[in-house]
Amino acid sequence: MAGGKKKTATKTQKKKNQSQIKVTEEIYALIAICVSLIVMFSLYTDKAGYLSVISRTLLIGLFGIGAFFIPIYIIYLCTKLFLFKREVLFSRIGLGITIALITSVLLIQTVNINDYYVQGSIWGSIKTIWHSQSEWHGGVVGFLIVLPLYKLVGKIGLFVIFVTLYLISSMLIFDYNLVSIRNFFGGFKEKASKVKFVDKKYEKDDYINLKKKDGASEGNKESKKDDISEDNNKIKILDFMKNSSLNDIEDNKKEKDNQLKDNIKINDFKQESKMPRDLSLDNTIIEQRGFNSEKAKEEESIDKEISNNIASKGSSVGASYVAPNADLLNLNNNNELDKDDKKALLANAAKLEETLMSFGVEAKILQVTKGPSVTRFELQPKAGIKVSKIVNLADDIALGLAAKGVRIEAPIPGKSAIGIEVPNKEQTPVFFREIVESKEFLDNKFKVACALGKDITGKAVVTDLSKMPHVLIAGATGSGKSVCINTLIVSILYKYSPDEVKLLMIDPKVVELNVYNGIPHLLIPVVTDPKKAAAALNWAVNEMTRRYKLFADNGVRNIESYNALYNKGEVPEKLPYIVIIVDELADLMMACPHDVEDYICRLAQMARAAGMHLVIATQRPSVDVITGVIKANIPSRISFAVSSQIDSRTILDSAGAEKLLGRGDMLFYPVGESKPQRVQGAFISEEEVEHVVSFIKESQRDAQYEEDILEHINSATIASEGNGDGDRDELLDEAIEIVVESGQASASYLQRRLRIGFNRAARIIEELEECGVISRRDGSKPRQVLLSKDELENMK
């Protein structure tokens, strides 16, 4: 105990001594600052009495013009060393300023050395300096430093030394190196060669050049701002409104004329066209569509040729089917980027770099791509910076850019860059006609092509449903889910005849898909009753089984091989692809969850090779609707805006969908991809759908529905309503007799009487309740038997 008390007392005594030392140091520092202020006052004025005369004579005699800076330095050192407890006396900038001041004092002494130097007498020179009435010299100390060097290297050698010292001080103050000086003065040729290489590399893309701002007069700005403005001249700006084959020739012509003029590149797209034109546009003028101009007439004629081209392609696939033309769809008259938009993008790029720099993240923006709904900034972080550090700054970046929210794609697949997606102030719609007229839609040879929209670069996104092979679509109300389903259906109507693709539509909401009733692609009218929907899925399972039996009998493995036999005349029947579209899965799961889940899982597991594909949509992506079994068997996903990150993880197995903007903004996650792709869904209005459907109905024969399917659905529905759906337990009749005779009903009672497990007994109790034999459960009260013995005898 005594030893512990001694140790405590020793520690306390040490702390007291340290505090006393600190107080003493601070007192000395305050005294030194006070003396320095008095000396500085006496140097700068002549109102300090004898002290002014003494200090001026002593300090100016020793240090010359440098004496005026000595009190300031003493105050600086005392404040930093004793009051703020800084161990490092001089920072990089402070050291540079000190070197510059000392060099200036020595330079003044060198310039005036002949006025104070007495030949052959150093002491006489010192006396001359001491009694000089001028302050423009280096004092005795400066003279003793300069004189040996003057004798050694001469005045020219001293000037070389001073220039070197000034260069060192400027490097410390402004934080640059000799390599940056070389790049600034001699690196223009290297930059021009790099620009030429980038232009050649991207010659196939549709870039046009902006004129570079003349920034030569801004060379004396702060180095940080100079770096940002220099980087802006290297940023490639891509606009989704200029990615069109309609403007391929003029864009390529402009690109060749301006290859080395600018470092900023832009990619827009307008109406895509398959008819090339040789039009010359002025580099600074963007011509818009006008109804009274010759250009408008020419574009209208081209649009008609496009429509005829689409119709001819559609009519070639089916002898009796005439595909609708593009004139039934609305045109997109949105304009390209103007100069103000480009300036705003560059300003946001600079602001993004500054925001990241403020958090210690040094990164360089390589490219800015403006999409329909978001603008993506592609940045490359400096080596050694973790990607997770940038990802964690999402909210801070949104605050710095005054954005609703940002989505960070780290890294961008196929690029050594990180994508920061910032919402546009105004969302630009993508019209369905743009996708229909794109070469991605016209020239593909997909088995079941489905148009989705455009990605962030303006490229049309068209997928092959036969490769997916099933897709799950989820999104909150109003996010664009129903429009996406309409684009999928209408793209099939534009591309394929009824002999090639058949549709089976299930619409529990009744009003979404009823417009398609009467088209020849439908197997049966749109199913709206949930119980009939389960029966329709049951028919699909039976059809899948029948097709596999046909494949086995003919020695083939899939629908392509079987139809190849039909083309050779070896089999009598051609099998069309069947696309099963379910518009609201949640309602079906509430009505008959077990049947729907079982049928969907069987189709998802086996229907691909049979040419049957599922498109399932829901506005409630919760785990009780999209079960684990359904998710495991449907690999491709499309997610629109959802309300929470939990819903996003349910549909995509990752976060991100909660940050979508709605109105068609989607994440497309096809099978085989490592990350989802952001797509702006194509918009098709109800009027456009009605025009397309009316055209098909008028130009084709009346729809001939499959009567066998309708009979199967009706019979299955009746059997289900009559409890003859195959799920009835074989012990149910015996259980009814036991319950009626005993007058009591419980799972444990049936378990003992029938000698079965508890789970099976509980299911039998549920069936008895559905049949009306026993009452519903009422808390802890026993169930009542509602069927009497006489009624049971009459039923027999």
Swiss-Prot record:
Keywords, alphabetical: ATP-binding, Cell cycle, Cell division, Cell membrane, Chromosome partition, DNA-binding, Membrane, Nucleotide-binding, Transmembrane, Transmembrane helix
InterPro entries in the cross-refs: AAA+_ATPase (IPR003593), FtsK/SpoIIIE/SftA (IPR050206), FtsK_4TM (IPR025199), FtsK_alpha (IPR041027), FtsK_dom (IPR002543), Ftsk_gamma (IPR018541), P-loop_NTPase (IPR027417), WH-like_DNA-bd_sf (IPR036388)
Ranges of residues in domain FtsK: 458-649
Oligomeric form and interacting partners: Homohexamer. Forms a ring that surrounds DNA.
Bilayer-spanning residue ranges: 23-43, 58-78, 93-113, 134-154, 156-176
Residues at which ATP binds: 478-483
GO BP of this protein: cell division; chromosome segregation
Membrane topology (UniProt): Multi-pass membrane protein
Intracellular or extracellular location(s): Cell membrane
Domain notes: Consists of an N-terminal domain, which is sufficient for the localization to the septal ring and is required for cell division, followed by a linker domain, and a C-terminal domain, which forms the translocation motor involved in chromosome segregation. The C-terminal domain can be further subdivided into alpha, beta and gamma subdomains. The alpha and beta subdomains form the DNA pump, and the gamma subdomain is a regulatory subdomain.
One Pfam assignment: FtsK_SpoIIIE
Protein name stated in the entry: DNA translocase FtsK
GO CC term, one of those recorded: plasma membrane
Organism: Clostridium perfringens (strain 13 / Type A)
Family: Belongs to the FtsK/SpoIIIE/SftA family.
GO molecular function: ATP binding; ATP hydrolysis activity; DNA binding
Cytoplasmic side: 177-796
Function noted in UniProt: Essential cell division protein that coordinates cell division and chromosome segregation. The N-terminus is involved in assembly of the cell-division machinery. The C-terminus functions as a DNA motor that moves dsDNA in an ATP-dependent manner towards the dif recombination site, which is located within the replication terminus region. Required for activation of the Xer recombinase, allowing activation of chromosome unlinking by recombination.
Domain of life, source organism: Bacteria
